[in-house]
Swiss-Prot record:
The gene is rpmA. It comes from the Bacteria. The keyword Ribosomal protein applies. The lineage of its organism: Bacteria, Pseudomonadati, Pseudomonadota, Betaproteobacteria, Nitrosomonadales. InterPro entries: Ribosomal_bL27, Ribosomal_bL27_CS. This is Large ribosomal subunit protein bL27. It comes from Methylobacillus flagellatus (strain ATCC 51484 / DSM 6875 / VKM B-1610 / KT).
Amino acid sequence: MAHKKAGGSSRNGRDSNAQRLGVKAFGDQFVSAGSIIVRQRGTKMHPGENVGIGKDHTLFAKVDGKVAFSVKGALGRKLVSIIPA
């Protein structure tokens, strides 16, 4: 009658799914209007010319063109712009 009693239940064993954040279109890459350029939490990068920002801080292209990254101002803000093609 060798039986094993019930083991204790662990309170671990969960994990959340990855959020898939980051740059989706890189410098000099051609994008069409509405394309997502950057998915981010907060404004790590700011919208420049022809770039819009969604309510979750996603940056997207407003026009067709090439993606351009730049740094602006004393605070060193990263800007994402679209140069129309």
